[in-house]
Amino acid sequence: MDSNTVSSFQVDCFLWHVRKRFADQELGDAPFLDRLRRDQKSLRGRGSTLGLDIGTATRAGKQIVERILEEESDEALKMTIASVPASRYLTDMTLEEMSRDWFMLMPKQTVAGSLCIRMDQAIMDKNIILKANFSVTFDRLETLILLRAFTEEGAIVGEISPLPSLPGHTDEDVKNAIGGLIGGLEWNDNTVRVSETLQRFAWRSSNEDGRPPLPPKQKRKMARTIESEV
């Protein structure tokens, strides 16, 4: 196993522990708590994949961070902070919408890269809107936290989420996953729209009513990708 993979996991575990202590003092805002919950799932998946205990990794990560801080000068820290581009966290969904459990009558699931696409193929003839929470850097989607498909009644009928065991994805990965979800939903004569935030940063190809146009051939291709169950 690559040593950098192990040490990266150890540092991530310790930093998550620090953030959790911060949240326990009721100091975190909604985006902070949302990322904390998502990162916890990611760490569990990575720990399982690597065969590493999170508690042991957290203690090792603490030693690594302490060693770095001992060697870090205030001036070097200022220069590092100044060179890192600031990311923005954008939210279409409330914390309740993100954390709500949902169920599928005809569940379909597929994996697209490091993203998992889930949808209920029992849904027909509905008006559906896609909402997402994600971070943006340089006006481009950086990290998708969660995307969900809602009916006009507020029911959740689809979802795109990062796989905890496969961290890392590009804005193009997200766009392809959105296309797959849309194609699967439209196959059952649903009308799908994308939120303004998603149009701007993740989809970038929609008509005037916010409904991304997909040619019939592409729709059929996208729908077929949804058909494969995991």
UniProtKB/Swiss-Prot annotation:
Subcellular location: Host nucleus; Host cytoplasm
Motif Nuclear export signal per UniProt: ranges: 137-146
HAMAP family: INFV_NS1 (MF_04066)
Protein name: Non-structural protein 1
Chain coiled-coil ranges: none
Keywords: Eukaryotic host gene expression shutoff by virus, Host cytoplasm, Host gene expression shutoff by virus, Host mRNA suppression by virus, Host nucleus, Host-virus interaction, Inhibition of host innate immune response by virus, Inhibition of host interferon signaling pathway by virus, Inhibition of host PKR by virus, Inhibition of host pre-mRNA processing by virus, Inhibition of host RIG-I by virus, Inhibition of host RLR pathway by virus, Interferon antiviral system evasion, RNA-binding, Ubl conjugation, Viral immunoevasion
InterPro entries: NS1 (IPR004208), NS1A (IPR000256), NS1A_effect_dom-like_sf (IPR038064), uS15_NS1_RNA-bd_sf (IPR009068)
Taxonomic superkingdom: Viruses
Record-level GO cellular component terms: host cell cytoplasm; host cell nucleus
Quaternary context: Homodimer. Interacts with host TRIM25 (via coiled coil); this interaction specifically inhibits TRIM25 multimerization and TRIM25-mediated RIGI CARD ubiquitination. Interacts with human EIF2AK2/PKR, CPSF4, IVNS1ABP and PABPN1.
GO MF, any single term: RNA binding
Gene name linked to the record: NS
